[in-house]
Amino acid sequence: MMHTHPVEQAALAWLDANLARRDAARPAARASHGVGGIALHVEQVVKRYNGREVLHGVNLRAAPGEFVAIVGRSGCGKSTLLRLVAGLESADAGAVALDGQPGGTPSSVRVMFQDARLLPWKRVLDNVAIGLPRERHADAAALLDQVGLADRANEWPARLSGGQRQRVALARALVHHPRLLLLDEPLGALDALTRIEMQALIESLWRRLGFTALLVTHDVSEAIALADRVVLIEDGRITLDQQVTLARPRQRGTADFAQIEDTVLRRVMRQESPAASDAELHFRSAEEFLS
């Protein structure tokens, strides 16, 4: 995902803030959802841009509290699908339903992007508390504590590292008690160590709070570390739905983890089998030798 211009970033943050205020004005609707995850049903969804079909009759389901990761090559349609689930765009055919009700932009859904979209003129705690009535600001402080930033509450966003900014964005999403959290490559701009730390934090909060999660990522290892299922989209179609039954927390160095990662990676890279891959490698080596 491309980084946005500072002015555009501020505008997007302002939009997020106003959406949060709108949702905060609907306490009855929010309370009616209860707690825990929400069921997601994507049925025969089609999406076109300028006459070109980018999603072809996609079907996807997530049970309440399930963590589903979507992987695939750039341009395959995975972020488009997430935007449709978020209600940021409309499908040309098919339907998205949450707990059996038509999707839209309900207060039970929050999105976390690669860009934290923090308001630069508000301190960290105030960024988390956007849209909350003053009596709920203690909730914002509690979420900051849960993401490990209680001591940075009065800092300006500009003084935070990239990983810290994403922790604030995560707290801001979760303070509204979403039943569905949509993660659009939220860790893509972070260094490897910070990324692993954030993965552990997201998993910990997901297990504690019980929301349904839908993650879009290019990182197959990240998908397997976090998800109950890894879904592969190729050319606008779901071509793999891989269960991940490994015990949590996941250990990347194990043979079982590596086997699932290899299975998904080979599908992403469109390699049919280890034998086919080895044969291709030997063929290329022979070509290089003869050249």
From Swiss-Prot:
GO CC annotation terms, alphabetical: plasma membrane
UniProt-recorded Gene Ontology molecular function terms: ATP binding; ATP hydrolysis activity
Self-association state and partner proteins as the record states: The complex is composed of two ATP-binding proteins (SsuB), two transmembrane proteins (SsuC) and a solute-binding protein (SsuA).
Species name: Cupriavidus metallidurans (strain ATCC 43123 / DSM 2839 / NBRC 102507 / CH34) (Ralstonia metallidurans)
Major subcellular location class: membrane
Positions annotated to bind ATP: 72-79
Any single Pfam family the record assigns to this protein: ABC_tran
Its EC number(s): 7.6.2.14
PROSITE patterns, per the entry: ABC_TRANSPORTER_1, ABC_TRANSPORTER_2, SSUB
Entry's family note: Belongs to the ABC transporter superfamily. Aliphatic sulfonates importer (TC 3.A.1.17.2) family.
Protein name, as recorded: Aliphatic sulfonates import ATP-binding protein SsuB
Boundaries of every ABC transporter domain copy: 40-260
Localisation: Cell inner membrane
InterPro entries in UniProt: AAA+_ATPase (IPR003593), ABC_transporter-like_ATP-bd (IPR003439), ABC_transporter-like_CS (IPR017871), ABC_transporter_ATP-bind (IPR050166), P-loop_NTPase (IPR027417)
Membrane protein topology class: Peripheral membrane protein
Physiological role: Part of the ABC transporter complex SsuABC involved in aliphatic sulfonates import. Responsible for energy coupling to the transport system.
Keyword field: ATP-binding, Cell inner membrane, Cell membrane, Membrane, Nucleotide-binding, Translocase, Transport
